[in-house]
């Protein structure tokens, strides 16, 4: 009988560029059989079980002898990251043991070292070493990157507005369409090849970024068959198995991330429903009976209950392989992930403070104080299916992804109001549910002509995103009388729905050329993006008439308390969206772009890439203002036609050292929500967002504080970087960057309405910064520390905004005695420093891996003060996390891990800051310390 054959697969890269090498000869010395690498630099050879030597050769490159390539029957031996250097007169064949090749990080570092633009990244091998289960955990280890709320990525301390996330090079919306960055925790690391962060702009990238573009690259062709099941559980002593946890009974499918109709609006979304005035005169008439039917169909539950909370659980499954056929190779990936997480915040605070009227008083005065508990249950269900086909000269891929997210909240708060003389204390109850869905399809192809002389890439990606907030419930009783009134706020029910469609198409064509007697590349292409959003809010308020209550919110809508022919002064609803619904809008945006760029080596040690991008962006709005005096019907609210030049230079100082310089122009545009008249309330915090089209005036309308003309922000970017690379992935780099902002958009506090925030263009600004990064093995201290390494990256920035005339004047008018008002301030959202550092241990022999990681971001301006509304700043969150992993079992197919998050028990806080005043709490949450256990099985 014949022994079952095995397979050798690998990838060959050019050391000088980090690009895959096409046409490399790979010969098995013992059998004289072999293969030639394809356009991805990949090869595959079938051999009998045994130990072999691979002879790898390519014209003008130093050959490689790869020894100790062990092949087992029916299995795949993957030899990744074979780097071939251009041949020099004193170079001979390089011999290396296959057992020494452990990681794809070296290929990523090679790409980073030789890329003409400034990039950072993290590879799949690092995911496995550290034990990161999702992209959010992994990407925060990249230089200059931080994660907000465990999900959203910031680059160089710049906020979400200036960071963009793409999937396989294509722009897709996330579960929150108002963010540029998609939730990073929805991608399991076992379907990701690399995460690349581009910090400098090149013409083939979208122009709407400043801090960085984060590209999540999923696997096309797994090198070997992979089947992986991962289980995880998390316990936070302050949140889990806590009998004081707040919840309420929802639908039967909440555990899957969507409502089953339990929270459906009783009017079916109609706008022609009767009001109280239509029913009170004739309760038994047609409108009166319809009014009572609708009133009776509102769910009675307005308050939750306390019960023991459950721990966090998660499960993910992935499957992938490639199937070689005589004329083509097929690849497939499948991933399914499920998370069910519970949070419980006790003594949460949300406050409003302002400067007193008297200029000689510096301490801030409370307007509203809210303190209490709230529970959150968050469910995420996601699926990803990928199919790829590779022929001799082409590659095609199809990815389908669906994400479903459901989040329920229940809160109970003590509320104190001292604003405008309306002094009262109240008990507040909140019930919320939000469900979000994202369905995305990506179809793409790559074609190679004349070997790899010509390369054509194209992608088409339609996406549908939905958000539904069914039946948000708010109730507030005045204490101690347990009365309900307009003064304390009437009970309210809110239904919000958003539906967004987008389609992205792009094509890139690259041609290898000879320029300055050296190899170069010309690249050109274009893209088209279409997005449409429908947004609608329908809200109801409930007047209670003469009905008396005992402080139980579930009493209010009992049948005996409702309006009827016998109880005409009972509880009744009023539909706030009739006759004008200013919170409903429709928006359309189109973006048509094109570019041309050239990559060349004008001197032996100098590489340059220059390019020009043009984008035509239009946004249209349909909606009305709050008073109904302005009615837009597909009115153009943004019309941008911009050119974006870019230059990137890299000078090779030595074989392992580079000096980089880049300059470019980019843009940041307002979102659909920001370019609207919508008012959107967050019932838990009591804060309201108002669209940027809404103007604000004072002094009887004679002084304009904001004109409602929200425009895009143009950004000029300049970068300089020195970097040195050493063996085993060690490196050191120093970077400097400088950015100018024309009319940046920031969230400003509305002067006439406390707790309301609006996006506005402010004065021009600048950001200057330094970045430091090193990765160093501790072997230089002692040989026994060979398995220890220290990774650190630090970003330090200084930002400055020139205040607008209205902001500067408002600050002068509300200045305290002795206070000197400068016409410049910090830029909103820009952290002054960012520190990522970690000590890692990795032993391939024993299978133990461990790491202690620290991350902190400096205090940054979140909401811009105006008049007597003072600035709000974040408080640094000192994140210290521990990860320990152990692989064991046959072929190390089992991995178990322990993680401890927020070891220092830091709080997430934002505070008001004012001249010679004690900082006051804007918001405060205590996430506590969490212990995570995980185990994964590879089959």
Locate the predicted segments by residue:
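Gram-negative outer-membrane beta-barrel transporters
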Residues: 731, 736-742, 756-860
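Short, acidic Ser/Thr/Gly-rich low-complexity loop/linker segments typical of extracellular
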Residues: 31-42, 704
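Transmembrane beta-barrel wall of Gram-negative outer-membrane proteins
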Residues: 7, 278, 285-411, 439, ...
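Conserved C-terminal beta-signal and adjacent last beta-strands/turns
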Residues: 490-498, 508-514, 519-522, 647, ...
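Outer membrane beta-barrel strand-and-loop segments of large Gram-negative receptors
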Residues: 487, 498, 502-508, 553, ...
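Short, acidic, small-residue-rich periplasmic hinge/interaction motif at the N-terminus
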Residues: 13, 17, 25-27, 57-61, ...
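Structural signature of Gram-negative outer-membrane beta-barrels, strongest in the C-terminal barrel
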Residues: 433-444, 459-463, 496-506, 512-570, ...
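Periplasmic N-terminal accessory/gating domains of Gram-negative outer-membrane beta-barrel systems
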Residues: 70, 75, 100-154, 160, ...
């Amino acid at each position: 009988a014949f022994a079952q054959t095995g397979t050798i697969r690998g990838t060959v890269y050019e050391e000088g560029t980090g690009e895959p090498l096409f046409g490399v000869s790979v010969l098995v010395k013992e059998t004289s059989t072999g293969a030639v690498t394809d356009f991805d630099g990949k090869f595959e050879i079938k051999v009998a079980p045994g130990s072999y030597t691979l002879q790898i050769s390519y014209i003008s490159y130093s050959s490689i002898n790869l020894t100790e390539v062990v092949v087992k029957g029916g299995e795949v031996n993957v030899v990744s990251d074979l780097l071939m250097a251009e041949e020099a007169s004193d170079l001979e064949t390089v011999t290396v043991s296959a057992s020494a090749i452990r990681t794809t990080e070296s290929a990523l570092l090679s790409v980073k070292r030789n890329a003409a633009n400034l990039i950072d990244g993290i590879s799949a091998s690092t995911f496995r070493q550290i034990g990161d289960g999702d992209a959010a955990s992994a990407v925060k280890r990249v230089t200059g990157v931080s994660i907000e709320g465990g999900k959203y990525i910031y680059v160089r301390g710049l906020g979400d507005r200036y960071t963009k996330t793409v999937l396989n090079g294509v722009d897709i919306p996330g579960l929150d369409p108002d963010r540029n960055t998609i939730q990073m925790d929805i991608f399991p690391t076992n379907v990701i090849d690399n995460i690349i962060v581009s910090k400098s702009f090149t013409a083939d990238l979208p122009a709407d970024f400043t801090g960085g573009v984060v590209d999540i690259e999923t696997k096309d062709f797994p090198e070997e068959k992979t089947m992986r099941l991962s289980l995880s559980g998390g316990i936070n002593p302050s949140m889990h198995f806590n009998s004081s946890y707040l919840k309420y009974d929802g639908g039967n499918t909440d555990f899957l991330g969507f409502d089953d109709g339990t929270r459906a609006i009783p009017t079916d979304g109609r706008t022609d429903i009767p009001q109280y005035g239509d029913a009170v005169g004739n309760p038994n008439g047609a409108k009166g009976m319809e009014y009572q039917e609708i009133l009776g169909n509102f769910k009675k539950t307005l308050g939750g209950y306390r019960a023991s909370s459950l721990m966090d659980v998660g499960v993910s499954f992935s499957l992938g392989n490639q199937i070689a056929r005589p004329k083509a190779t097929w690849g497939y990936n499948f991933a399914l992930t499920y998370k069910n997480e519970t949070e419980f915040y006790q003594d949460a605070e949300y406050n409003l403070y302002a400067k007193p009227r008297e200029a000689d008083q510096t301490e801030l005065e409370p307007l509203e104080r809210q303190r209490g508990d709230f529970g959150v249950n968050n469910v995420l269900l996601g699926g990803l299916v990928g199919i790829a086909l590779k022929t001799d000269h082409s590659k095609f891929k199809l990815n389908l992804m669906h994400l479903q997210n459901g989040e329920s909240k229940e809160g109970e708060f003590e509320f104190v109001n001292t604003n405008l003389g309306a002094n009262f204390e109240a008990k507040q109850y909140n019930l919320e549910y939000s469900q979000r869905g994202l369905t995305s399809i990506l179809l793409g192809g790559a074609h190679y002509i004349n070997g790899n002389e010509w390369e054509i890439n194209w992608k088409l990606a339609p996406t549908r995103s939905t958000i539904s907030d069914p039946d948000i419930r708010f109730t507030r009783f005045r204490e101690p009388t347990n009365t309900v009134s307009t003064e304390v706020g009437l009970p309210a029910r809110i239904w919000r729905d958003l539906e967004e469609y987008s389609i992205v198409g792009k094509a890139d064509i690259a041609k290898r050329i000879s320029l300055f007697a050296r190899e170069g590349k010309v690249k050109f292409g274009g893209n088209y993006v279409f997005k449409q959003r429908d947004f609608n809010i329908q809200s109801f308020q409930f007047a209670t008439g003469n009905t008396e209550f005992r402080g139980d919110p579930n009493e209010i809508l009992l049948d005996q308390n409702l309006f009827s022919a016998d109880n005409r002064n009972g509880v009744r609803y009023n539909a706030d969206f009739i006759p004008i619904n200013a919170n409903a809008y429709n928006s359309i945006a189109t973006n048509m772009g094109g570019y041309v760029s050239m990559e060349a080596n004008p001197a032996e040690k100098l590489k340059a890439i220059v390019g020009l991008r043009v984008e035509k962006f239009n946004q249209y709005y349909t909606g009305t203002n709050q008073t109904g005096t302005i009615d837009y019907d597909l009115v153009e609210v943004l019309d941008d036609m911009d050119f974006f030049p870019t230059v990137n230079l890299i000078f090779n100082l030595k074989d392992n050292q580079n000096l980089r310089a880049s300059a470019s122009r980019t843009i940041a545009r307002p979102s659909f929500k920001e370019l609207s008249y919508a008012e959107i309330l967050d019932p838990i915090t009591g804060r309201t967002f108002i669209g940027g089209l809404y103007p604000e005036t004072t002094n009887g309308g004679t002084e304009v504080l904001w004109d409602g003309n929200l425009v895009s922000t143009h950004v000029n970017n300049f970068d300089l970087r020195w970097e040195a690379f050493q063996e085993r992935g060690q490196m050191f780099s120093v970077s400097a960057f400088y950015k100018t902002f024309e009319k940046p958009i920031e969230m400003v506090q509305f002067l006439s309405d406390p707790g309301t925030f609006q996006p506005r263009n402010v004065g021009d600004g600048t950001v200057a910064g330094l970045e430091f990064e090193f990765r160093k093995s501790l072997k230089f201290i002692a040989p026994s520390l060979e398995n220890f390494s220290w990774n650190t990256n630090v970003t330090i920035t200084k930002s400055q905004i020139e205040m607008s005339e209205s902001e500067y004047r408002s600050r002068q008018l509300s200045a305290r005695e002795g206070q000197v008002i400068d016409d410049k301030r910090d830029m909103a959202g820009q952290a002054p420093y960012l520190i990522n550092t970690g000590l890692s241990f990795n032993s391939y022999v024993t299978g133990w891996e461990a790491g202690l990681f620290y991350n902190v971001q400096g205090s940054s301006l979140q909401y811009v003060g105006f008049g007597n509304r003072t600035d709000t700043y974040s408080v640094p969150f000192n994140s210290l996390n521990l990860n320990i992993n152990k692989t064991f079992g046959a072929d190390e197919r089992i991995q178990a891990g322990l993680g401890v998050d927020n070891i220092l028990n830091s709080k997430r806080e934002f505070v008001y800051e004012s001249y010679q005043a004690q900082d006051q709490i804007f918001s405060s949450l205590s996430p506590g310390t969490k212990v995570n256990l995980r185990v994964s099985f590879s089959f």
